[in-house]
Amino acid sequence: MSGLKQELGLAQGIGLLSTSLLGTGVFAVPALAALVAGNNSLWAWPVLIILVFPIAIVFAILGRHYPSAGGVAHFVGMAFGSRLERVTGWLFLSVIPVGLPAALQIAAGFGQAMFGWHSWQLLLAELGTLALVWYIGTRGASSSANLQTVIAGLIVALIVAIWWAGDIKPANIPFPAPGNIELTGLFAALSVMFWCFVGLEAFAHLASEFKNPERDFPRALMIGLLLAGLVYWGCTVVVLHFDAYGEKMAAAASLPKIVVQLFGVGALWIACVIGYLACFASLNIYIQSFARLVWSQAQHNPDHYLARLSSRHIPNNALNAVLGCCVVSTLVIHALEINLDALIIYANGIFIMIYLLCMLAGCKLLQGRYRLLAVVGGLLCVLLLAMVGWKSLYALIMLAGLWLLLPKRKTPENGITT
């Protein structure tokens, strides 16, 4: 067990996972799914949850039996050795320069909607968000969990308020009959919606900080997954009911438009604040997870700067290093005005590759029906890589490159290189 402070309970874990899954997607993905699949997207959410369940269960069982700040990298190391563990860790960290600045831009975009910010003002908002992540992170996982549980409650409250004010009744939900489902539209929606469930790998890094990881980590993961899926489905119903989607409308503008329609322009700030907090929650759990991964990877040298914990058993040095990388990436991307859309797709391929490595580790570490679920999850990950298409080559090249280029490490006990 790691030296990190064990302070997370079940409710806090549910709040952490549900907000990490909702994140930037809750304001945008339901509108995108409605655009590509129409009413078929109402069936796509339960189908997607069923497909993700094998992967989630494998994460839950591995996290219960092998809780570690190393997350997926730790599972892979136990199954295939320390070299692939390091490769997996660096593969996860390689998302920092692309994924986090993109999420920062989305979060700062709500400031643009509220105050008309542009250019340097948005940059200051992004840097301010990182400062807030640092402040919360130095207070420990419990502080992050408490905040994100509140954010999860606000997101749910917003959707419930829209349902109530919009007088949406179950009889009004336009569920297509099973025989009328268009498979082409369903598959198109699934390919868009999968990214809402990227976040399980980040949550795995917090398993060792639960008070009772064997009992509460799997429960938090499964309940958080179902809660996030229910919120996404509820958002999709709202978007379809108010016809708040289209090729000429920004996907992230759908819920704010509905809020203004129901509650007036004065309520726009409510949607923007909740949207910002949802983005912040996703950013926060990823940055805290990256910090714990960096800390765990530095444990081969306990005297290393990054391997040290604060007096409160928090990896502050690793957190500072991760945030430093985020600041540099944000400044470079702002200066060069880089378009991140294509790069995010490449990053998504890396996430699927990490999921696949976790499933392969599960095939080796687990027994019985859980091993079978790991096999099913692995096949689903291969299918998802195929759906990404040729852009998945980026993840494969990164994996091969890290395997070849990472220097071999000598273990002090026997001098064996890994």
UniProtKB/Swiss-Prot annotation:
Catalyzed reaction equations: L-methionine(in) + H(+)(out) = L-methionine(out) + H(+)(in); L-leucine(in) + H(+)(out) = L-leucine(out) + H(+)(in); L-isoleucine(in) + H(+)(out) = L-isoleucine(out) + H(+)(in); L-valine(in) + H(+)(out) = L-valine(out) + H(+)(in)
Membrane topology: Multi-pass membrane protein
TM annotation in the entry: 16-36, 42-62, 90-110, 114-134, 148-168, 183-203, 220-240, 258-278, 318-338, 342-362, 379-399
Key word Transport present: yes
Keyword Cell inner membrane appears in the UniProt entry: yes
Keywords assigned by UniProt, alphabetized: Amino-acid transport, Antiport, Cell inner membrane, Cell membrane, Membrane, Transmembrane, Transmembrane helix, Transport
Disruption phenotype: Deletion increases the susceptibility to DL-ethionine, DL-norleucine and DL-norvaline. Deletion also results in intracellular accumulation and a reduced rate of export of methionine in the presence of extracellular Met-Met dipeptides.
GO molecular function, one term: antiporter activity
Effect of residue 195 to A: Strong decrease in methionine efflux
GO BP terms, alphabetized: cellular response to amino acid stimulus; isoleucine transmembrane transport; L-leucine transport; L-valine transmembrane transport; methionine transport
Listed Pfam families: AA_permease_2 (PF13520)
InterPro entries: AA/rel_permease1, APC_superfamily
Domain of life: Bacteria
Induction of synthesis: Induced in the presence of intracellular L-methionine, L-leucine or L-isoleucine.
Segments on the Cytoplasmic side according to the record's topology features: 37-41, 111-113, 169-182, 241-257, 339-341, 400-418
Subcellular location: Cell inner membrane
Control of this protein's activity: Efflux of L-methionine is inhibited by the proton ionophore carbonyl cyanide m-chlorophenylhydrazone (CCCP).
GO CC terms in record: plasma membrane
Membrane topology (Periplasmic): 1-15, 63-89, 135-147, 204-219, 279-317, 363-378
Functional description taken from the UniProt entry: Catalyzes the efflux of L-methionine, L-leucine, L-isoleucine and L-valine. Activity is dependent on electrochemical potential.
Family stated for the protein in its record: Belongs to the amino acid-polyamine-organocation (APC) superfamily. Amino acid efflux (AAE) (TC 2.A.3.13) family.
Designated name of the protein: L-methionine/branched-chain amino acid exporter YjeH
Native organism: Escherichia coli (strain K12)
